[in-house]
Swiss-Prot record:
Gene that this polypeptide is encoded by: ATP2A3
Binding locations of ATP: 353, 442, 489, 515, 560, 625-627, 678, 684, 706
Organism: Homo sapiens (Human)
Family membership noted in the UniProt record: Belongs to the cation transport ATPase (P-type) (TC 3.A.3) family. Type IIA subfamily.
UniProt name for this protein: Sarcoplasmic/endoplasmic reticulum calcium ATPase 3
Molecular function as annotated in GO: ATP binding; ATP hydrolysis activity; calcium channel regulator activity; calcium ion transmembrane transporter activity; calcium-dependent ATPase activity; cysteine-type endopeptidase activator activity involved in apoptotic process; metal ion binding; P-type calcium transporter activity
Keyword Ion transport: yes
Amino acid sequence: MEAAHLLPAADVLRHFSVTAEGGLSPAQVTGARERYGPNELPSEEGKSLWELVLEQFEDLLVRILLLAALVSFVLAWFEEGEETTTAFVEPLVIMLILVANAIVGVWQERNAESAIEALKEYEPEMGKVIRSDRKGVQRIRARDIVPGDIVEVAVGDKVPADLRLIEIKSTTLRVDQSILTGESVSVTKHTEAIPDPRAVNQDKKNMLFSGTNITSGKAVGVAVATGLHTELGKIRSQMAAVEPERTPLQRKLDEFGRQLSHAISVICVAVWVINIGHFADPAHGGSWLRGAVYYFKIAVALAVAAIPEGLPAVITTCLALGTRRMARKNAIVRSLPSVETLGCTSVICSDKTGTLTTNQMSVCRMFVVAEADAGSCLLHEFTISGTTYTPEGEVRQGDQPVRCGQFDGLVELATICALCNDSALDYNEAKGVYEKVGEATETALTCLVEKMNVFDTDLQALSRVERAGACNTVIKQLMRKEFTLEFSRDRKSMSVYCTPTRPHPTGQGSKMFVKGAPESVIERCSSVRVGSRTAPLTPTSREQILAKIRDWGSGSDTLRCLALATRDAPPRKEDMELDDCSKFVQYETDLTFVGCVGMLDPPRPEVAACITRCYQAGIRVVMITGDNKGTAVAICRRLGIFGDTEDVAGKAYTGREFDDLSPEQQRQACRTARCFARVEPAHKSRIVENLQSFNEITAMTGDGVNDAPALKKAEIGIAMGSGTAVAKSAAEMVLSDDNFASIVAAVEEGRAIYSNMKQFIRYLISSNVGEVVCIFLTAILGLPEALIPVQLLWVNLVTDGLPATALGFNPPDLDIMEKLPRSPREALISGWLFFRYLAIGVYVGLATVAAATWWFVYDAEGPHINFYQLRNFLKCSEDNPLFAGIDCEVFESRFPTTMALSVLVTIEMCNALNSVSENQSLLRMPPWMNPWLLVAVAMSMALHFLILLVPPLPLIFQVTPLSGRQWVVVLQISLPVILLDEALKYLSRNHMHEEMSQK
């Protein structure tokens, strides 16, 4: 049943043809079950393991590698001679890479499905219903409850379905619905109709929602929605409908894969076609088919060379290292790709409660009456420091600290705060923090009493556990609480009846202490406490007191105010009818006003500076809260989201104001707004959608079940460590300390990771370009193979992989949070940078071919043939006069490939040292600024010597040890790459940067 909150309870019962006393008949239950189904959230139909495995092979790069592996297997099968064993190494290594990637991918997918399943923890096992087939209340499985059932709930119960309240069987009914609405305090419910068709869930005070908890009271309601039709079920449907977006990095790598696949296809076909004339050369036994297969192998080698096989592993390692650094800053990342996405965040949509504020209600102001006569009323005003539940703080009047025990009014105010209170402070020894036990508002009063210490209790020798309630305990030893008149909506107050624990010198007897909404309490006051005496409360005094409270409640502070009062001569408790809550207001009359406290959920001290950093970094901060607009705007001003006098028109909206806008106006509002108040979960999702339509990268925080769809939809969903399992499962990141400052630290880390990632991706790609140029040149010029596929795999995965990973440890730029967020569409490599790394790659390719050629032509241990003979080596035979006196087996020597491989590895190590900074010279940013890079380079060179010297590795990699003279030549060919890159960096700093600035 939709909009049950609009109708009187009797009309809702009539709709279901049921009575509150009799309940549904068995026939009605059967009909409803057939119509609505069971009262449970269906399990998510996850993908099968096979489907998940197949998904991992949808990536274009992976498919190219898979094809290369399959072709290599086929070619290896037909190999002859000593290469039979080594031929299988290459396809096996590629397959191992693909299997490892698939395992990681499947594991991550399995984790992602837990968000929807986590919703089930909010479904109760059992429910209490009234049905006509049995007298009284019966317990049934919650899944068997149907719309129309009469359901009973009491304190401690989890609500089993969405209920329209029809009767409250206690003084009050309070419900913790924070998982659904995000409200930090429990909500008082009632049974009257709410004639507002656009009421948000927070305003539906006559409804109980499935999965929420009863914190006090007892009530009966009629089930109006079950299963997927409940508010919890709607959230489940929203989450199931959200398709996870690919991160900017994933999209860039997809695009890179497409471009690379096209380039590989063109180059491979070109190499094969260009060499058609050589298919029938004598080296192939005169067989055209064998020649075609030989050049097909070269084309496959080219594909292997062009694909940076180590890139997925290096990116994963870099992101994993980033997550460890973030975890040390209290940001726990659940999804690796989102680490990089943080770096291009342009909007942070943050909850107010607990993230921007401490979520620890704190009294920051109070007043008692100093003087009162017929014409005026003077107040003693005090400020209190401290923003958490830690019972430490200073009470000041003006600029001067005061001893509260010197003010009789403050002694009585502290007494009321301590006794008219059902909550307490507790020290959590495991966490090392003070925590509330009970309601946030009352805990703030308990904490205030500890700060005031009106009886000058010696607190020095106390442990923290004892300190939590020391001053409150002293007051409670003087007065004994007899009973409590609970809060009710009509009188907006609560009170306690107390008697002295020992005879008072003045003969003082029982008292009633009252706290509540100022207008309601002051209306029932006839006098006011001035020090230790009582004075009449005149209309002038009443108005001055209310004016001060209005000022506190509506100014820049928007404090939540509570009035405190005493009834000095209450009726005897035997004469009071405590079963009839309608009489409570009669007992809370003829009151004496004592004072007023103003409290707020204080902003976290470090947040204002973090918001300033966000603005410097070009990131817009938007507060989203369920609180009213006035409070939200006031907190925004305190935090610097709005200026002190800034006009907030068009920059702050309530959920209802937002709904009143046209779709296009809503889009524009999301582009300019910095505050949304009184919003529902659906608003959050719409805000994210609108921001995404402007290509904004949005980080969205949340902690409740209601936040899960928006967390899943946003590029970066951020859940609170204290939040629900559903929110954490739907989010990419969890803040263990619930602190906004941790988000900003994570964004900074994300930017640093992206900067480093660009360095190692370009480093790896320049290596691949060099390998492609090398193979392409040897094929075009008709030279012997300089590098074979298994060597290329070794370089791409191992020798290049270690320095590339170490580049992830590069120190971040000092101005990293002073730059605008980069566009998610910004290419990894484009324009000038593409030319730079193409130039380096071409040098790498030329150098490797030159090294192999040098051995054939110039090396003392080589055959000393000329370049023309080398180009025509495939025509070598005993009958060919061109090769007279030359052993044709020399073209199978391992020396030229070893020379080429050694030059490739050495140049790549030089490239790695050059990559500490994108544009800074090695003289300004030397390699030792990243010690891990030096270690990685040393390890890569050690591994290179390992394959040269330790059997059976030389056989597998087709290499052989080099002489000292040959190593000198390797260094002579390799080291100039440093000078080339320094020249390109110089141009980049002094010319390209100026051109980009002018643009």
